Curated annotation (Swiss-Prot):
Protein name, as recorded: Small ribosomal subunit protein uS2
Gene3D superfamilies, per database record: Glucose-6-phosphate isomerase like protein, domain 1, Helix hairpin bin
Cellular component terms (Gene Ontology): cytosolic small ribosomal subunit
Gene: rpsB
Pfam families in the record: Ribosomal_S2 (PF00318)
Organism lineage string: Bacteria, Bacillati, Bacillota, Bacilli, Lactobacillales
Length: 255
C-alpha cells in the first residue's frame, strides 16, 4: 500500500508546478498537463516516488544514518525544523552557509563557539562580565543559533540530505555531490532532476505541500529507527486514485 494517497497530495496542492515559461525541460516526464499557464505535476508518479524516497530514507535510518533536512525559504523553514526535530535529526532552515559540508571543520569551530557562549551563560560567567560585553555575546549567540542551531548536535557530516527546493539550495546540492552524499529532494517543475539522487516531483512552494512530504520523510526515519510503521492513512491510498481525479481537481481549482 502506498505511503501517501493521491487525495492527500491533491488536498495539499502538491500537483501545482510553476508557470510554463519557468519550467526545466528535464522535468517534462513528471508533468501531467498544463492548465492556465501552470504546469501540473503527474501525481501518479509522485505517489510512487514518495514510496521510493520513503524506503530509501527508512533504510538509511535503520542503519543509523545522520540525516540533514534543508529548506531555507519561508514556506519550508517551519516544517523542516519541526519534522527534523520530531525525527531526532538535524536541519538548516535559514541561509545555507557555503562550506557547511565541504568545510565542516570550520563549521564545527563555529558550533563550538555557540556552545561556549551558552555555557558562559549557564555557569554564571555573564553575571560578572560588563553589560556591553554580554550584549555582544548574546548578539553573537543569536546569529550562530539562527544559522547553526539545527546542526549544533550533528555528530558528523550527514549520510543523507533531504532538500526542499534544490533549485534554491544549489550550493547545498553541489556540496553534497562533491562529497558523494545522496540527496533526496522535493523537485518542482523549474528544477534540474539530474542533480538529485532520489526525486519527489512536487510543488515546493506551498506550505501544506512541503509539510506533507517532509512529514513523510520524518515518518520514514522514525520507522527505520524504531521498526514501527509511523505513517498514517494508508487506507486512503491508491484504491480510488486515478488520472480522472487529477483532471477533476485541476479543472475545479482553475475555474
Amino acid at each position: 500500500m502506498a505511503v501517501i494517497s493521491m487525495k492527500q497530495l491533491l488536498e495539499a496542492g502538491v500537483h501545482f508546478g510553476h508557470q510554463t515559461r519557468r519550467w526545466n525541460p528535464k522535468m517534462a516526464k513528471y508533468i501531467f498537463t498544463e492548465r492556465n499557464g501552470i504546469h501540473v505535476i503527474d501525481l501518479q508518479q509522485t505517489v510512487k516516488m514518495v514510496d521510493t524516497a520513503y524506503e530509501f530514507v527508512r533504510e538509511a535510518a535503520a542503519n543509523d544514518a545522520v540525516i540533514l533536512f534543508v529548506g531555507t525559504k519561508k514556506q519550508a523553514a517551519e516544517a523542516v525544523a519541526e519534522e527534523a526535530t520530531r525525527a531526532g535529526q538535524y536541519y538548516i532552515n535559514h541561509r545555507w552557509l557555503g562550506g557547511t559540508l565541504t568545510n565542516w571543520n570550520t563549521i564545527k569551530k563555529r558550533i563550538a563557539r555557540l556552545k561556549e557562549i551558552k555555557q558562559m551563560e549557564a555557569d554564571g560567567t555573564f553575571e560578572v562580565l560588563p553589560k556591553k560585553e554580554v550584549a555582544l555575546l548574546n548578539k553573537q549567540r543569536a546569529r550562530l543559533e539562527k544559522f547553526l542551531g539545527g546542526i549544533e548536535d550533528m555528530p558528523r557530516i550527514p549520510d543523507v540530505i533531504y532538500i526542499v527546493d534544490p533549485h534554491k539550495e544549489q550550493i547545498a546540492v553541489k556540496e553534497a555531490k562533491k562529497l558523494g552524499i545522496p540527496v533526496v529532494a522535493m523537485v518542482d517543475t523549474n528544477a534540474d532532476p539530474d542533480e538529485i539522487d532520489v526525486i519527489i516531483p512536487a510543488n515546493d512552494d506551498a506550505i501544506r505541500a512541503v509539510k506533507l512530504i517532509t512529514s513523510k520523510m520524518a515518518d520514514a526515519i522514525i520507522e527505520g529507527k524504531q521498526g514501527e510503521d509511523a505513517s498514517v492513512d494508508f487506507q486512503e491510498a491508491a484504491a480510488a486514485d486515478s488520472i480522472e481525479e487529477i483532471v477533476e481537481v485541476v479543472e475545479g481549482d482553475n475555474n
